[in-house]
Amino acid sequence: MHSSKCPDLANIGRRRVLAGIALAMTTSSTRAQRLDAFPSRPITWVVPFPPGGAVDAIARIISRKMSESIGQQVVVDNRAGSGGIIGSDLVAKAPSDGHTILINSTGLVVDRFFYPRVPYQSDRDFVPVVLAATLPSVLVVPADSRFRDITQLLKAARENPGKLSFASAGLGTSIHLASALLAARANVELLHVPYRGSSPAVSDLVAGRVDMMIDSVTSQRQNILAKRVRALGVTSLDRHPQLPEVPTIAEAAGLPGFEVLTWCGVFAPKGTPRSVVERLNAEINKAIAAPDVVEALKQLGIKTAGGAPEVLADLFKSETERWQKLIVEYRLNANQ
């Protein structure tokens, strides 16, 4: 009669549990090491607009400073088109490891209101990293324009509905929205001429092919000083320190409370680990606090911001609510 020993199921189960714990600890440790090693290769910072604009300048100045301390090069990659959608979509579809990040502004909030098919959901497919900077814009006309002030411009617009044109850097960009909001608040009809970025729009403005443009002080200050364009009003509630002689649109046009500020936020793809977001946040905060970065941006009329990721998240939410309300209230659309 043969005897056989039954296997000790309790011991086998215990060994499997211990092996599973060991494997989980090893995997967790390996993952932690990978996160601690971030960044492990150069970081691509996507600017969804052409070179030469304010958003591009902000990214380039900050990226140079970041490259000195983060252990890898931070490379700016301009991916312009569709008011910022092409570049933003590239980041939305990038691996969520923090090596591809985005800088964008109001367009990321409102693009779904102006374009029939946006390939991402801006409130779900991006993780806020940090609010980098804010800056006001300025309404400018060609140097030889017949308009000496904003009241003359608005009077002509009322007398010639749809005849006066304004340039923008694309549908849904902050400078498009500023002009559309001005037209709506002043009860005038303007012709919208969208361009693929600020630079070609400015070229046509200087050449007199369009009547006006609201653009960042950063992009227009040198043109104003060189008298290639004439400034009629700034979009902030207070006069700009670098353009003290230029009135606010609120005061010059008699539109109390008129204010449109461009904010520039940094975003990562959805699913980016919190530790990576916090590292990026810390590095960008450190960069924008550096005196040379503060001074370089100040010379361009840009005010650094900073703070925790939640600061940008709260701003994104409030800006979405604000512009959604304004778009409905004033019936803003792509043609305005």
From Swiss-Prot:
GO cellular component terms, A-Z: periplasmic space
Record keywords, A-Z: Periplasm, Plasmid, Signal
Highest taxon of the lineage: Bacteria
Signal peptide positions (record): 1-32
InterPro entries (UniProt xref): BUG (IPR005064), Bug_dom1 (IPR042100)
Subcellular location(s) per record: Periplasm
Family, similarity comment: Belongs to the UPF0065 (bug) family.
Entry protein name: UPF0065 protein in tcbD-tcbE intergenic region
